[in-house]
Amino acid sequence: MTRSRLLLVGVITITSAAAATAYHASHPANRTAFSTRAGSIAPAASMLEPRSGHTATLLPNGTVLIAGGMRRNQDFYKSAELYDPAVGKFQATGEMNERRVSPVAVLLRSGKVLVAGGWIGHGCTDSAELYDPSTGKFSVLASRMSTVRGDARGTLLPSGDVLITGGADHDSPGGIASAEVFRAASQTFQPVSPMHFARVAHTATVLQDGRVLIVGGRGDKVNAVAEIYDPKTARFTESGSLIIARYKHTAGLLANGGVLIAGGSDEHDWNGNLNSAEIYDPKTGKFQATSPLNDKRFKLPEEAVLLESGDLLVAGGSRQAELFDPAQGKFLVVSGSMDDARHFMTETRLRDGSVLMAGGYPNNDQATAQAWIYRP
């Protein structure tokens, strides 16, 4: 596996007594049992292409845009497809103008999707394009990012602009500190003050007050120090430290305004998978440990899915999906399982409250076209 592939980040079926019996027979006795309250997952239709390191974006019409990604190694895609929940199938749409793995993909207020950067082979790109659902086509933007970025993070700000942070470039595959904002009105990129630390495979979560929490990631080493981006000042400030430094983890905004940080890996990557979890409190600017995941997992979708119940769905990096229940402060194991542990898969909440989980690869690095549906 190439070094660049290791850095990619990024986003699960039978429920019966027999399945539960088999599960408990092959797992530690102290593991949380299947919970009917946690919902279940089942296979859905397959994508048109096997993909990992792709993007999945819910469009205003309820369909999901799947773009880019890779089959394995240097087999990168320009192609894109749409998942239609009404018929439960994937269909082709226009392809991107450049092959991309782990680009930024953000739905804009206009209904179009910004796709920027990503791995293109032995390096990254600074190019960007817009997907227009009304035409089913991608168009190249005249403006380019201030630097090439692979596995950066893109976050929609309250203003409708997009904050883009970190990632890797040709000279710093371990992460960069620079940041910029995509101005939606002018369709241009504008550099802002850099982060205090270089980061790739980090998370960026919009808080209830509109600021953005940046957590984890890797520069010269895996980082524990968090930062807050304030759109009013266009600057980053340090804000507390993780109890355990991590990258390739997931993060999710809780209904009470806190942020769950779960899983990921330490400096040892495949040999350092984590099951620990912690919660960031924006009122105190500190992290506090919470109950661990039932499975160690990394290479997760960067954003855990917030359900209508207020629970957070965490999937990927394991055959099993888990639900974090804030009221209990613990993770519940979801009934059903994927065919294998899936890394760099995506998870997207649909309009009906279910969640589409698509693609990813197991330990053999061969991506799958299979998708799954989680139902609460």
Predicted feature descriptions by range:
Residues 14-24:
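Hydrophobic alpha-helical membrane-insertion segments, chiefly the h-region
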Residues 22-376:
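Kelch-like beta-propeller repeat domains
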